[in-house]
Amino acid sequence: MAEAQRRAVRIIDSEREGKSMPASARIVKEALTFDDVLLVPGHSLVHPKDTDLWSRVTRGVEVRIPFLSAAMDTVTESRMAIQMAREGGLGFIHKNMPVGQQAEEVDRVKRSESGMIMNPITLGVSASLRQALALMTRFSISGVPIVEEDGCLVGIITNRDLQFETDLDLPVRDVMTSEKLVTAPVGTTLDDAERVLHQHRIEKLPVVDESGHLRGLITVKDIFKRRQYPHACKDEHGRLRVGAAIGASGDDLERARVLADAGVDVLVIDTAHGHSEGVLRAVARMREELPNVQLVAGNVGTANGASALAELGVDAIKVGVGPGSICTTRVVTGVGLPQLTAVMDAVDGAAGRVPVISDGGVKFSGDIVKALAAGAETVMMGSMFAGTDEAPGEAFLLEGRRFKTVRGMGSLSAMEEGSADRYFQDEGRKLVPEGIEARVPYKGPVSDVIFQLAGGLRSGMGYCGAATLEELRESASFVRQTSAGLRESHPHDVRITREAPNYHL
């Protein structure tokens, strides 16, 4: 047995000891959630616009804003993940799809923009215009380099070349640009590439070696995106970062390998109960087989759960048992922990070894401030992003207002489509759901939502006198509030006549 798996067995065995306790001692403590507390304002020299929202998702992946989109099939596919990364956060592709499709979603994110596309999509000289058009449509690109069998660049075909062609069965060699083809040598910087693109009024610059073999592609779109989104979350090659969800079954190791080959930056073993034998063994197995992949595991709600995962070498721990707006785990099973206490306990259990992700329970931007002040380094949200343009699904009209659908991965419909294993129910003919399907108001572009959330976070940091999230975690203090205090916190004794973009009940 591999060392990591032996360690998992030791952790499991040690936690089985000492379970018995008197009935009167089984109410362990009081637990709190976001609405139960407020942060105490303090002396501040910090202006909100000067705050720094840099944080870590895992030990090896950083973000410029501490926001993650959840791996839910009504929240995150490639379109959402692309925009989350551009804004400086990170999106996690859900796993309610075949592994090949999930890998393709990851690939779309990695190819969406780049400092230099390292392995550009190409076609051979005998390919048809129909094939070229299909490839451009599939990957949302405007041109394709044409290469010989040995990889030597011979031309490029763009959508302008296809614009007035009626015979799509022609080979690309008859239409492609081959004479006076502008190229750049290996080692060309983006600044140099920008000058060449501008000088020749072209949109794509192939990068070739001394033998004429295609080694990369620089596009004007990527240069524009770099200016438009200067704080984008990117890897060392200038590509947008993306995460993806896997389960804890034996088949998910192969899924993890395929996603790693597709270029995924972070994998999350996404289960309802991360402090279970099956998940601990899966973490140990994944750590042995894919030691270089950034691995998140969850969900947990206790210090013991977080400590067990940290001991097995995960790169981050995801916290939340039942706080989500579309989750019914706590009322169906009677099990869970209010989110603020869960985060604090998990932070204590992690003991600084790995970052903690607070997953769920966010209704307002103030909840994000509280989660980060409690010790989380990032906050994962689902319903908050579900009503945006980038979320999967179409908006619909109801009683004159626009909505989009959101469903928990524990809802009956989601479980029937593949997420039942998240709740350890993949073998039954009947399912016991732990989530619901609902609608949320349409919110427009996710960038608008992120702007409001980041603005609320910056203001909260200003009130607390924290210039960075690390300072917020170290210096913030809470007070408990009564139900009367909570009522006082919200608008009261008035009728709202104009809705604010960051306040909805």
Task: Please state what every model-predicted region is.
Residues 71-76, 123-127, 184-188, 208, ...:
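Glycine-rich beta-to-alpha transition loops that act as phosphate-gripper elements at the mouths
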Residues 62-67, 116-120, 236-244, 286-301, ...:
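Short beta-strand/loop segments at the ligand-binding rim of alpha/beta enzyme cores
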Residues 3-43, 123-124, 185, 195, ...:
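Alpha/beta catalytic cores of nucleotide-metabolism and tRNA/nucleoside-modifying enzymes
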Residues 89-101, 264-276, 318-333, 362-395:
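Glycine-rich phosphate-binding active-site loops on the catalytic face of alpha/beta enzymes
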Residues 80-81, 254-259, 301-319, 363-377:
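Catalytic cores of alpha/beta
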Residues 51-63, 70-72, 101-141, 146-148, ...:
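Bateman/CBS regulatory modules and CBS-like beta-alpha motifs in cytosolic regions of diverse proteins
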Residues 99-107, 215, 220-232, 251-253, ...:
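Active-site-adjacent beta->alpha loops and helix N-cap segments on the catalytic face
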Residues 95-109, 153-166, 197, 207-224, ...:
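Terminal amphipathic helices with adjacent charged low-complexity linkers/tails
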